[in-house]
């Protein structure tokens, strides 16, 4: 049997720039058995797919000069994994920066303030140039020791023949330091020979402060980058904390509370009202309504009875439940989602890949240019001091401060701006790629709509007031546990309806209806089919109910003693900002598609109100991922949703955007999270992404243009022609200015108005979706053959792996598998024998009992 390829996660240490992650990725990719490797510098993580042993992978990383450790995957290790994601780097860098500044400020005062502006200094140093040089040497040495990590990483990478940005920082700072030490010795010699002219000349050639300034500026950039890293892992840490910590199990006929890791398959556990389900299981006693919003994104509670399945992290809103554990530990749905999100953590922004390539060429090229510059000037007869100064100027002016800061600073500011407005970009790639969206797929419930049913219309019959209708409906529905009842109760509370009607003989009748007695009158409430059994419904009210239904609303009929008293319409209403948000997206040239499981009539009504371009109705949760896959054939797709049934689609999409009011699982399966649950934040996120990407391009353009102009100038290319030569001091100043320009440009993002649609521009590569609609219809017409398979042994959603097996068969177009129903509906374009279907399922260790 061929080894099964799996995704394994590793924590990587010692990486400092894009060149580091590229080297680790290259080293691991060369290991036999590794089919895919992705290293994320932002999360210091690595995802590896293949059959290679973890010890071999770790050794490959260590041979490349870095460290690696395999991450835990068990549910009980979630807290330890979350601890691994804790931001420890930022406090260390902040401490290094503050300490460096404590020595840099007096160093700059002595070197720049006194020498250039004649600021006062202690009398003991006045005129004592050697002492001034020694103090500068001391301060610089201390700063270099504080920031020794640059030198360790830089020279270690150079030793491994893979120079990175730290290498240039180390070489530039060390070259300045070495040159200044040489000048200090030369000045000391001149003073010993009483050559004061030479002493004064040498005094102005100290560059200790530049050596220290390089390290301090890079530390600023590293700290900004570390802060950005810390924020991108917040969502993953929240997901890990969502895992239940304890459960109440029955042992020796007693209820005892145990740690979640002590719950085993087959254990009996109990859940009281208001408590979360600890593990996946089956109800063996009791019934209740479960709020499954933690898994489905739907806020309406789902009725559960004996034999129904329950999932970890869902909330028991009412009723005492006794359940048998079926999936525990890493096998629960929640744990599988945690693992899925962890697998997706090792991603890389496209612009980081560009940085990898540039770094691999830029660093060794600059070193070669510096060496070549020195040799050429020596060959043309210049002094060693002149040649050395030109070489140092090349190293220093091309110090990749601007290049290193261009992306992380812009991303840091962009992320900060987003966070300030409730828009969280989980990674650099999400911030970069969101603005390139061509198609937006919107889940209806909780995204376009509020996700909470509300009363929209009250239509009493003649002779009955709205207050009377609402009072009777309130009295009847307050005893109901039906999800739509809460909408009527909320409306009654808003209307200050008092509890002055008492219901007796209350019965929840099968068939979506309620009945009871108020005094001597029998009242009924429910759908049209139910009420028609007990009261005559006028034709005008039937037409009104159809009109309400066409608007995407659910009409509830109420009757009293065989007389209809009115209709109350309930609907999951559209959010106030949804139509405007859709319009803004369309003005950007983005096609907007709405996905919903509703029937076509309701879906079109809501789609019309929202103003979307296309409506795809009747989409089952597992079908959303398939729709997104089809849309991706037309262009770059962003999926917006709020529940776990959106998670596969969020993952399949080029960019997954989660509404914050949804589940933590959906949030962590997505790339962007809208904390305020406003659809208008979707176009805002796209604007911010575009602005940030533009800012990064501006920063990189400046960084490269600066180097293209600065390196030849520093090398003395214009010296023979125009007499221009660049003093290393001005090279350092230029380098500092380049970094300042990059940071300042990035800070401009703080002024960006992300909710201002007046400057929106349409994308040039907008797509046409009519063909996809036609193709989808054609595919539905082609599915003329269907077979329903009854399957035993499927206990949870993970058992639906048979879907992939069936869909891999030639002639099978789609397989819709339900573990709850114990069925698989197979749609075929060609005949597939029952024997083949049966064998395919039974190869997965399930039993086929019947095929219709």
Language-model regions, residue ranges each:
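Flexible metal-binding regulatory segments at protein termini and peripheral loops
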Residues: 1-133, 143, 229, 254-255, ...
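Conserved ATP-binding TGD loop and adjacent catalytic N/P-domain core of P-type ATPases
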Residues: 2, 22, 35, 437, ...
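Conserved cytosolic catalytic loops of P-type ATPases
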Residues: 31-55, 205-206, 237-331, 429-473, ...
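Transmembrane helix-loop-helix hairpins at the membrane interface
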Residues: 92-246, 357, 458, 723-728, ...
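ATP-driven catalytic headpiece of P-type ATPases
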Residues: 93-95, 314, 438-442, 448-481, ...
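Membrane-embedded alpha-helical bundles of multi-pass transporters
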Residues: 116-130, 159, 178, 417, ...
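Juxtamembrane coupling segments of multi-pass membrane pumps/enzymes
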Residues: 187, 196-198, 212-273, 304, ...
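Conserved catalytic phosphorylation-site environment of P-type ATPases
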Residues: 295, 354, 389, 402-476, ...
């Amino acid at each position: 049997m061929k080894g099964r390829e799996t995704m394994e996660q590793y924590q990587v240490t010692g990486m400092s720039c894009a060149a580091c992650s590229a080297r680790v990725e290259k080293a691991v990719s060369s290991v036999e058995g590794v089919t895919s490797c992705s290293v994320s510098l932002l999360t210091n993580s690595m995802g590896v797919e293949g059959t290679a042993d973890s010890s071999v992978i770790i050794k490959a990383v260590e041979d490349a000069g870095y460290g690696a450790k395999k991450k835990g995957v068990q549910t009980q290790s979630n807290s330890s994994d979350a601890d691994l994601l804790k931001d420890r780097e930022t406090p260390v860098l902040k401490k290094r920066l503050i300490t460096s500044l404590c020595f840099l400020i007096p160093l700059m005062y002595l070197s720049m303030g006194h020498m250039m502006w004649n600021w006062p200094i202690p009398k003991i140093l006045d005129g004592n140039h050697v002492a001034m040089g020694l103090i500068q040497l001391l301060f610089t040495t201390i700063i270099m020791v504080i920031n020794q990590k640059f030198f360790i990483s830089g020279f270690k990478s150079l030793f491994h023949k893979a120079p990175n940005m730290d290498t240039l920082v180390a070489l530039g700072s060390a070259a300045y330091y070495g040159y200044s030490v040489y000048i200090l010795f030369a000045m000391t010699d001149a003073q010993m020979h009483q050559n004061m002219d030479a002493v004064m000349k040498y005094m102005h050639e100290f560059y200790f402060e530049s050596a220290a300034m390089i390290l301090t500026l890079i530390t600023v950039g590293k700290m900004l980058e570390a802060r950005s890293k810390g924020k991108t892992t917040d969502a993953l840490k929240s997901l890990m904390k969502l895992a239940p910590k304890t459960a109440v199990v029955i042992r020796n006929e007693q209820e005892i509370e145990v740690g979640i890791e002590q719950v085993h398959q087959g254990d009996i556990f109990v859940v009281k009202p208001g408590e979360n389900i600890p593990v996946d299981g089956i109800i063996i006693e009791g019934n209740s309504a479960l709020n499954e919003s933690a898994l489905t994104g739907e806020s309406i509670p789902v009725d559960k009875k004996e034999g129904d399945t329950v999932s970890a992290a869902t909330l028991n809103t009412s009723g005492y439940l006794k359940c048998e554990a079926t999936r525990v530990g890493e096998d629960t749905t929640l744990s599988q989602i945690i693992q899925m999100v962890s697998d997706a953590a090792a991603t890389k922004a496209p612009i980081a890949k560009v940085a990898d390539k540039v770094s691999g060429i830029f660093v060794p090229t600059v070193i070669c240019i510096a060496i070549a510059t020195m040799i050429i000037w020596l060959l043309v007869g210049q002094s060693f001091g002149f040649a050395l100064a030109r070489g140092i100027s090349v190293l220093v002016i091309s110090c990749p401060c601007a290049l290193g800061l261009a992306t992380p600073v812009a991303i840091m500011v962009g992320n900060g701006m987003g966070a300030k407005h409730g828009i969280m970009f989980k990674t650099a790639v999400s911030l970069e790629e969101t603005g390139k969206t061509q198609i937006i797929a919107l889940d209806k419930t909780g995204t376009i709509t509020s996700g909470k049913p509300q009363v929209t219309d009250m239509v009493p019959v003649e002779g009955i007031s709205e207050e009377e209708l609402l009072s009777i409906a309130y009295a009847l529905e307050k005893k109901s546990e039906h999800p739509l009842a809460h909408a009527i109760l909320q409306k009654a509370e808003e209307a200050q309806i008092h509890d002055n009607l008492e219901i007796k003989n209350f019965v929840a009748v099968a068939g979506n209806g309620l009945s009871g007695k108020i005094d001597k009158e029998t009242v009924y409430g429910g759908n049209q089919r139910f009420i028609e059994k007990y009261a005559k419904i006028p034709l005008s009210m039937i037409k009104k109910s159809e009109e309400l239904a066409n608007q995407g609303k659910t009409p509830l009929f109420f009757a009293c003693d065989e007389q209809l008293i009115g209709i109350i319409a309930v609907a999951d209403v559209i959010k106030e900002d949804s139509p405007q948000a859709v319009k803004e997206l369309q003005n950007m040239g983005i096609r907007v598609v709405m996905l919903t499981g509703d029937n076509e009539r309701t879906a079109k009504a809501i789609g019309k109100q929202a103003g979307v371009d296309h409506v795809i109705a009747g989409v089952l949760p597992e079908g959303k991922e398939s729709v997104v896959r089809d849309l991706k054939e037309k262009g770059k797709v962003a999926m917006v949703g709020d529940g776990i049934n959106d998670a596969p689609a969020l993952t399949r999409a080029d960019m997954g955007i989660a509404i914050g009011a949804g589940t933590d699982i959906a949030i962590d399966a997505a790339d962007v999270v809208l904390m305020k649950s406003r659809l208008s934040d979707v176009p805002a996120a796209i604007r911010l992404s575009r602005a940030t990407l533009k800012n990064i391009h501006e920063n990189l353009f400046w960084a490269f243009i600066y180097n293209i102009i600065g390196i030849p100038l520093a090398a003395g290319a214009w010296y023979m022609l125009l007499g221009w030569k660049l003093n290393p001091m001005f090279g350092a100043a230029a380098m500092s200015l380049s970094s300042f320009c990059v940071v300042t440009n990035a800070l401009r993002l703080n002024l960006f108005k992300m909710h201002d649609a007046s400057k929106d521009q349409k994308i040039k590569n907008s797509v046409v979706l009519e063909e996809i609609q036609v193709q989808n219809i054609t595919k539905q017409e082609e599915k003329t053959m269907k077979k329903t398979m009854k399957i035993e042994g499927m206990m949870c959603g993970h058992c639906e792996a048979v879907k992939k097996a069936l869909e891999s068969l030639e002639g099978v177009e789609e397989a819709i598998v339900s573990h709850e129903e114990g069925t698989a509906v197979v749609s075929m374009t060609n005949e597939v024998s029952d024997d083949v279907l049966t064998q395919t399922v039974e190869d997965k260790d399930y039993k086929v009992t019947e095929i219709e």
